[in-house]
Amino acid sequence: SRVDYTCRVADLLAQLATSDKGLSISTCPFGYDSAAACEQSIGNVRLVVAHLQELHQRTGKHIHLAFEAEPCACFSDSGALIDYLATSFSDDERRYMGICFDLCHSAVTDEAYEKVLSQAERQNVTIAKVQISSALQRDSRLCSSSIGDLEELADSTYFHDFITSHW
């Protein structure tokens, strides 16, 4: 099950980590429809949190379960995810969870990062991880060989998130 898998990943991280600082596991927040954030999902998260608490007591490694807002998922923006975590879990439970703040996803959903950071602080939700994706901006002065190199990356293997604007 997903719970068992996540607990095994946490065990492995605790074994491999050379420090007890900044440890986290990223995961998708509850699936891709609103029914996913149900009591069963909350119960499953609580099982993982209980494992992380026990692991922390046993090893000294404090690992956060970091939920990442995903465009088109149950929680497509960080603000809604922060609200959900703040209202569905206790302060003690939230010591072992937080969000994985993906700046690319934030751009796709048109979220202001300053607002997300202040909301997380205000609602006592940890930013357990920050993902900073790099992006390329095409300069019309690129030589033809550079354009060819970029065209090789135009493949679904490399596709992640994108945003377009029309001026």
Segments the model singles out, each with a brief description of its role:
Residues 54-166:
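Acidic/histidine-rich catalytic cores of soluble enzymes
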Residues 1-98:
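Active-site acidic/histidine proton-transfer and metal-coordination neighborhood
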